[in-house]
Amino acid sequence: MDKFIKGMDVSSLPEEAALGARFYDEGKEGDALEILKKYGANSLRIRLWNDPYSEDGKPYSAGTNDFTKLVALASAGKKLGYNYLLDLHYSDFWADPGKQFPPKEWAYADADTLEKNVYDYTKDVLLKLKRLDLLPEMVQVGNEITNGLMWPHGKWDNVDNIARFISAGIRAVREVSPDSRVMLHLDCGGNNARCREWFDAYVQRGEDFDVIG
């Protein structure tokens, strides 16, 4: 992945297609990934939510990005020559600076257990992808983690836990897929002071990473 990355998040594409979305190039209907490839796209971002369904099995929508959809998108992309970034939210739905809720299954876990869960889950996902020959070129450990992840244990006022949780994910990536680059992803790229504060705090405590997103 040394070439310039030109990509997009296509996580909602299968759900959009199922709801009737159609894609066109100069008036001719075509496959969205093929159209994007034609115009120079070379990388896909695909998010993964732990369990994006309610207790009675209803999908949360907005992509309902479970493992099955990840495999379908990654497979379609690989066939067309795309690289892809795996975006691990460690949540059942959108994780962002305003909400970083752990998965339902982890809701009552303490910090030690959460650290183990992150490692085990990340490792399990990557091992499954490895068996399918679908390992990603890059793994994003957490999504928009400016204010931490898996609240309340991983809120910004507990940087030690944030570093523990992220590092657990990184260790799993390095173990299973050492050729995958590791990205840490904030939402405040235009705020130099906040980014410096965050990364200064993290690098004193956490595992090494490769890319800032």
Where are the regions a protein language model picked out?
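N-terminal substrate-binding region of glycoside hydrolase catalytic domains
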Residues: M1-K78, N83, S91-E115, G213
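Active-site-proximal beta-strand/loop segments in catalytic clefts of secreted hydrolases
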Residues: V10-L13, R47-W49, D87-H89, V141-I145, ...
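Active-site cleft segment of glycoside hydrolase catalytic domains centered on the general acid/base Glu
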Residues: N65-V71, A95-F209
